[in-house]
């Protein structure tokens, strides 16, 4: 596929353009089906499918008590609940008799339709035709399952994959399991929101001069994997102008972009040191429309005129990780190949999880349903409002943690710098060596620092452990990653921040270069 070609709006052109990206294993995947999936009339007795009758299920009904507000143990939120009831016959579109049964590999239609509408409203692919028939979504069993299926479909021993130099390392493990080679892409580690994230100049030079560069013995990259918003571990986001440049590079050098976005809805307005606990999410002026248009970073899908972006989303961060429920967005051709893999491996994700998520979203809609909104619109609006409340809580936790870190003696002595995050769950703290030379044995010194932190009663992640190539990132890996997600309450986050400051101070009090 070449830059400037007409957008591929039909399956035939998608197949022509993206067949070369497929793993050699893809051609051997086919489900050897022995059943006839055609519809039968109601008067036919079904003896073909190996499905237990729903009366064999030990659960006949479930009642869900659904929070309207996260952390609603506050007395003022005493009545902030709604409910959902599920039984063998209801809700009519997704009763237990259906959701607990074997189901379509791509996902149960009610939730699948909601998810596609959700993506279309927020990040509609630029290559989409009017009927949205050339792209689709499939549900999957959590982010790692999505990654596994994507990389198994587009990677093999001949593939080179680019990944941000610090990343969620299981993604790298998934790539390497296919035999593909991983190379690190330099990042700008800064709290400047207009320059942070992938170093576009470095990426341009690397690709434009591939034949003479450091990886000239490898095949030219066919894939970029990126956590572009609220990046793990850095909490940084690739600004819009960089996204446009990266997409142009993808066109020029013909590679796919796998955009992993578990944190994208957890946007953080900039920290205000004059009003450290200021939270724009509490503003009465913040509508769902403004949140979507002014707060959220737009997906690479919205730039994707060529259909070369595969987007991964999950319910783990905005609902619950134990559901193991995620979804993949891509052009119809690539998505069918991913679905072919699911057909012979995991099959459908948990129907119980799908039923719980769908019923919860529907209940949120019903509790706020008005005559001006259809159920479809109310479900979208209700779910976005829930996400905004989650984002608001995370933003408060971010502000509280930053304030507590800035008040520590260690920070005020210049022993560390806080890289304020722009989205997500993570904050990184860069260690400042001050009058000391940066140690040659950096990983060992970071391990020693970790022991001082544990001695003070706090556990974090060491930056070098999340490096794609520790040697390549040696000069940038002297940071700590802390998460603001799991702490019980404000007091625990404040205490953890104090302990971090104390641990870093003790480390430097005992440090010998």
From Swiss-Prot:
Positions bearing Phosphoserine: 90, 92
Entry EC number(s): 2.6.1.57, 2.6.1.7
Record's keyword terms, sorted: Aminotransferase, Cytoplasm, Phosphoprotein, Pyridoxal phosphate, Transferase
Pfam families in the cross-refs: Aminotran_1_2
UniProt binding sites for pyridoxal 5'-phosphate: 102, 143-144, 232, 263, 314-316, 324
Keyword set includes Cytoplasm: yes
Superkingdom to which the source organism belongs: Eukaryota
Biological process terms in GO annotation: aromatic amino acid family catabolic process; aromatic amino acid metabolic process; L-kynurenine catabolic process; L-methionine salvage from methylthioadenosine; L-phenylalanine biosynthetic process; lysine biosynthetic process via aminoadipic acid; tyrosine biosynthetic process
Cofactors: pyridoxal 5'-phosphate
Top EC class, one word: transferase
Induction note: By aromatic amino acids in the growth medium. Expression also induced in ARO8 mutants grown on minimal ammonia medium.
Subcellular location: Cytoplasm
N6-(pyridoxal phosphate)lysine sites (modified residues): 317
Annotated CDD domains: AAT_like (cd00609)
Main location: cytoplasm
Pathway(s) per entry: Amino-acid biosynthesis; L-methionine biosynthesis via salvage pathway; L-methionine from S-methyl-5-thio-alpha-D-ribose 1-phosphate: step 6/6; Amino-acid degradation; L-kynurenine degradation; kynurenate from L-kynurenine: step 1/2
Gene3D superfamilies: Type I PLP-dependent aspartate aminotransferase-like (Major domain) (3.40.640.10)
GO cellular component annotations of the record: cytoplasm; nucleus
Region forming the signal peptide: none
Catalytic activity as recorded in UniProt: an aromatic L-alpha-amino acid + 2-oxoglutarate = an aromatic oxo-acid + L-glutamate; an aromatic L-alpha-amino acid + 4-methylsulfanyl-2-oxobutanoate = an aromatic oxo-acid + L-methionine; L-kynurenine + 2-oxoglutarate = kynurenate + L-glutamate + H2O
GO molecular function terms noted in the UniProt entry: 2-aminoadipate transaminase activity; aromatic-amino-acid transaminase activity; kynurenine-oxoglutarate transaminase activity; pyridoxal phosphate binding
Binding positions for substrate per the UniProt entry: 232, 481
Biological function: General aromatic amino acid transaminase involved in several otherwise unrelated metabolic pathways. Mainly involved in tryptophan degradation. Active with phenylalanine, tyrosine and tryptophan as amino donors and with phenylpyruvate, hydroxyphenylpyruvate and pyruvate as amino acceptors. Does not accept glutamate or 2-oxoglutarate as substrates. Also active with methionine, leucine, glutamine and kynurenine.
Similarity comment: family membership: Belongs to the class-I pyridoxal-phosphate-dependent aminotransferase family.
Protein name stated in the entry: Aromatic amino acid aminotransferase 2
Organism: Saccharomyces cerevisiae (strain ATCC 204508 / S288c)
Lineage: Eukaryota, Fungi, Dikarya, Ascomycota, Saccharomycotina
